[in-house]
Each structure stands twice: as C-alpha cells, then as structure tokens.
Regions:
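Alpha-helix-centered segments that form part of catalytic cores
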Residues: 93-115
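Active-site loop-helix segments enriched in His/Asp/Glu that coordinate
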Residues: 116-155
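Structural motif
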Residues: 6-8, 52, 122-127, 190
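Long, charge-dense
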Residues: 76-82, 86-88, 96, 143-161
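N-terminal metal-binding scaffold of metallo-dependent hydrolase/deaminase domains
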Residues: 1-42, 162-199, 209-219
Length: 219
C-alpha cells in the first residue's frame, strides 16, 4: 500500500529543506518526495501519516557492537535498582548476567535505538559475529552497514544511544539521503528545524520507519 509520511519540515539531506514536505513510500522504497500538495496529488488514495516536527533520513549508530554486548540495558522492572541508562564498565561487571538476561538486554537496546531514530547499525564487515546479537538484529529490521568512515572513538563519559552524541550535523549522522528509489528508511523528530534537532538530540524521536515499515512511534 502506498503511504505518504508528511511533516511541517522535510530535511532530505543533500537537497534543500522542504516546508510542509512529504515522502511517498511504495513497499520498501521511496516513490516520491517534495511538497506535500505535489506528492499527494501524484498519489491519490494513498494512506497519509502526518507527523509533527521534522522528517529526515534514518540515523546511523556507529557503536552498536559496544552498546549491545558491552552494555546492559535494564528492564523497566529494574529501574528502581539500576536506573534507566545503559550500564557498562564496573557497573556491568557487578551484574550476574545469564544468557537470558543478555538476550533481553540486546532486545531492549535495539528497541531503544529505534526510539532514537536509528535505522542503520555499523559493524565490521557489515555483520555481527556474536550469534545472540546477530539473531536479535535480524529480527529487529535494523539495517547493518560497514564501519567505513566511523570516527573510531566514543565521545563523552559513557556510551550513548543518541547518534548525535558524536557531534556531527544531520548530514554526518544519517546513513544516506532521502532519494527517489532509495530504501524508505525515515525518522521523525519533535523539533522545529535541524538546529533544534541537533540541540535536542535523537531522544526527540517521534517515529522510525525502516524499509517502509513503521517500527517505532511515540505517539
């Protein structure tokens, strides 16, 4: 089914921002993008999803292997004891983690990446060798891409689920621009423009679409 994702501002990357913009998705590919009126006129009968904020390409997470196997993502039932943030280093070493707990952590980590507008995970050789992680990633729908061009270092005091934590602008954080014929990997953020988005960070994510499928929405 043809679906149109529309937002007050479309930031395709590599092309000018489009006020009241839209992206038409046919299956898993982008069929059209531009001003909403033009996209809608070319796709009569399409389902329309209207989002607040900015519509962008999906983001790329450079440190997925670290975040998924060297960090523990607490279950909500553990928040009182462990907090909500990923645990690593000495805090991780203090936990007694069975494979069952690790499996739950990896699944939660992937869900939280989706909740940060992430659609692509960078990994050496564009694959995960850890079977537990590889299986969970395959089920998640997240795309695995090479680490070519990675900054190579974790910035800040701790691993961060926010791809913008590397300090890049939008163009340096997405996996690729929105283009007709490309995979429909999109993200929507509750921000007025790119400046506001990079200031607020990817936790402002409203929705994440991978290959045309809506895999996360916060509202």
């Amino acid at each position: 089914m043809l679906t149109i994702h529309a937002a007050p501002l479309l930031l395709p990357v590599g092309a000018a921002p489009v006020p009241d913009g839209a992206v038409a998705v046919d299956g898993g590919r982008i069929a059209a993008l531009g001003p909403y009126d033009e996209v809608a006129a070319a796709a009569p009968g399409a389902r329309v999803r209207r989002w607040p904020g900015v519509l962008t390409p999906g983001l790329r997470q450079w440190h997925a292997p670290w975040l998924l196997r060297r960090c523990y993502h607490p279950d909500p039932r553990e928040y009182d004891a462990l907090g909500e943030l990923p645990l690593w280093g000495a805090d991780l070493a203090a936990l007694e983690l069975t494979e069952t707990r690790w499996s739950g952590s990896v699944r939660r980590g992937l869900q939280r990446m989706l909740g940060h507008g992430t659609t692509a995970l960078a990994a050496p050789g564009a694959r995960f060798t850890d079977p537990l992680v590889a299986q969970a990633v395959a089920r998640s729908g997240l795309r695995v891409v090479p680490v070519t061009g990675a900054p190579g270092l974790l910035l800040g005091d701790r691993p961060d689920l926010d791809p913008f934590a590397e300090g890049h602008d939008l163009a340096g954080t997405v996996h690729g621009p929105l283009e007709v014929g490309a995979r429909a990997d999109l993200a929507v953020f509750d921000a007025e423009d790119e400046t506001a988005l990079t200031a607020k960070g990817a936790a402002s994510c409203v929705a994440t679409v991978i290959e045309g499928r809506l895999l996360y929405r916060s509202r």
